[in-house]
Amino acid sequence: MTIILEVNHVTKRFGGLTAVNDVSFVVNQGEILSVIGPNGAGKSTLFKLISSFLSTSSGDVRLAGERINNLAPHIVARKGVVRTFQETTIFRSMTVRENIIVSHHLRSRASLWGFFLGSKVAKADEHSFGQSADNIIDFLGLQAIRNELASTLPQGHLRALGMAIGLATDPKVLLLDEPFAGMNHDETMHMVDLVRRLRDERGVTVLLVEHDMPAVMKISDRIVVLNFGEKIAEGTPLEIQNNERVIEAYLGSEDAAIGM
């Protein structure tokens, strides 16, 4: 297998608090890898370190061998590590299609402001970006809401739009931040299918943080488990379900069920 992303002995300290402590793992190209752990385990902090929204105290993160930690987040995104957010990248006054078109600015010759101000370079890109947006809409099954304002969308459609925005940037590794949060069972299973299709049909490597353990166990090739900022386990879903350290970490927590 080809390694696409490496997390090497990454540590993050906030004053006297160590939020992430000497965490290492690799993500193989074309893999779906989940990061789980009880509340406060350091999952969100780790995601921010990988996407460079936080700087590492020590250690490094590498994309295809190139060190990317502590670069500006937009540079990391341009290199191919793209993080989806829980609505913060969505322009609520724009339609679904317009949001996807605007998100192409990460790989455009024009700036984002160029799209708003109508620069010549932006106009030259507009047609191809429109076609790409339509392809993404078709791929994710968003045709029925393509012209709906983002502000009117229910939770499941907002999650799908967030995924579409990430996909529009042509990522090598897509970081999904709680993609199943707030969804019912049917919506979750639909999103699980979409994530699999991203990998199988688009060749996107997926790294996700999620609390929905049944969904994690269903979708993941491998799982990394954090507790108190440290990696305590790594393996297949079956190996994680039967790992005594993982079971002990979850016992007595709000996340006690680990999806067996």
Residue ranges of model-derived segments:
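Glycine-rich phosphate-binding loops of nucleotide-dependent enzymes
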Residues: 1-260
